[in-house]
Amino acid sequence: MKHILLLLLSFFVPVVWGQQVEQFKLWPDKPEAGEAEIFVYHPAKGGKAAPAVLICPGGGYRGLAMNHEGHDMAKWYASNGFVAVVLKYRMPEGVHTIPLSDAEKAMSVIRGNAAKWNLDANKVGVIGSSAGGHLAASLSTLAADANRPDFAILYYPVISFDNMTTHGGSK
């Protein structure tokens, strides 16, 4: 049993260790927005320009599930040929446009680095889970055209803040 487990692990370790991760502040010239940042996971294989995804973790707009809805997802997408970008967005704290402005800025940074990161600027999507799904849907419908994603994947998104349809943790 131990040999089988070690054999299986030997297939997954190079995938995780082979990924390059870069970290960037979204608003380096604005100290008050200092916590907004992105983590960029590059696919192991080079070659033609890759599609990209901006990943918006959930957390009820009170915090962020950065590991299982962010970094773990990014590792999987990067291992499957995507440039995967995890967004650590700011909490709204009464100003509901703050997370959306961070997501729009992230899309601008991704497309602006298309050549450097070897990604296809016409194949940039957004992924969101829970409250991050709400943010991804908002980005897909409300963002300026230049910052609008080409596709969206919503995992158990919050689609309404109506008392009858939204769980209490997302209000």
Which residue stretches match the model-derived regions?
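N-terminal cap/lid segment of alpha/beta-hydrolase-fold proteins
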Residues: G18-P51, H96, L100, T166-H167
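Bacterial Sec-dependent N-terminal signal peptides
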Residues: M1-V21
